[in-house]
Amino acid sequence: MALKHFNPITPGQRQLVIVDRSELYKGKPVKSLTEGLSKKGGRNNTGRITVRFQGGGHKRSYRFIDFKRRKLDVVGTVERLEYDPNRTAFIALIRYTDGELAYILAPQRLAVGDQVVAGNFVDVKPGNAMPLSSMPVGTIIHNVELKPGKGGQIARSAGTYAQLVGRDQGMAILRLNSGEQRLVSGACFASVGAVSNPDHGNINDGKAGRSVWRGKRPHVRGVAMNPVDHPHGGGEGRTSGGRHPVTPWGKPTKGKKTRSNKATDKFIMRSRHQRKK
């Protein structure tokens, strides 16, 4: 899908660049595959703000997406491609031959009328799902599981993908978008292709209001606050903060490594922080 640019007839349209969604389905989602979604406003169950700068935004309903793809060897036909407000990628409505409906993440080059299938030995074409052990080396994939049967967790955002670059003792070696190379069990399922909406990274909201429509409130800098609100706050006139950058809770930020999950270090063959060679 292409990008839409606008003539500057209003200040908010001068910089505006959005994705052309004219080819997507314009009706409502399948009701049996949706549920209500209440606004949290960044608060937890005690009512305290746990995520800052969230609140408001347009009302949404949650679409159930099949990330597991465990309906094996049953052919499904793409009924339509839809917009999903809860994610950056587009979704596809699949009607299986037994009549069941399901939403999946739509990969690039998937069109209405195409057929998709999940199984241990299926064709390598966009939308099909299979174990990593059954895929040819070099395949571009998305919606990759980290644990067999848990459902896809890697490469689900718009335009993202991973690549199967090798195998070793029942494990698959993946190269991720970040440059990281990682070991994943060969029994884990993944879908073929790259995720749809690759132009998402090129959009320009044009005005602050578009962020508000999405439920994002203004992101206030620490140096613009008072000392009671942030370690960088206060001072006479404009200041630089006066110390190394920290979070509102005093922990170093901007480059401080925070990874503490040593249990999965053995699965990372090449860190995303290593220099690109």
Curated annotation (Swiss-Prot):
Alphabetically ordered keywords of this record: Ribonucleoprotein, Ribosomal protein, RNA-binding, rRNA-binding
Subunit structure: Part of the 50S ribosomal subunit. Forms a bridge to the 30S subunit in the 70S ribosome.
InterPro entries, alphabetized: NA-bd_OB-fold, Rib_uL2_dom2, Ribosomal_uL2, Ribosomal_uL2_bac/org-type, Ribosomal_uL2_C, Ribosomal_uL2_CS, Ribosomal_uL2_dom3, Ribosomal_uL2_RNA-bd_dom
UniProt cross-references to SUPFAM superfamilies, sorted A to Z: Nucleic acid-binding proteins (SSF50249), Translation proteins SH3-like domain (SSF50104)
Gene3D superfamilies: 2.30.30.30, Nucleic acid-binding proteins (2.40.50.140), Ribosomal protein L2, domain 3 (4.10.950.10)
Protein name, as recorded: Large ribosomal subunit protein uL2
Native organism: Brucella ovis (strain ATCC 25840 / 63/290 / NCTC 10512)
Gene Ontology annotations of biological process type: cytoplasmic translation
Pfam families with a match to the protein in the record: Ribosomal_L2, Ribosomal_L2_C
GO molecular function terms attached to this record: rRNA binding; structural constituent of ribosome; transferase activity
GO cellular component labels: large ribosomal subunit
Sequence similarity: Belongs to the universal ribosomal protein uL2 family.
Job of this protein: One of the primary rRNA binding proteins. Required for association of the 30S and 50S subunits to form the 70S ribosome, for tRNA binding and peptide bond formation. It has been suggested to have peptidyltransferase activity; this is somewhat controversial. Makes several contacts with the 16S rRNA in the 70S ribosome.
Taxonomic placement: Bacteria, Pseudomonadati, Pseudomonadota, Alphaproteobacteria, Hyphomicrobiales
Superkingdom, natural source: Bacteria
Annotated stretches, region: Disordered: 222-277
SMART domains, sorted: Ribosomal_L2, Ribosomal_L2_C
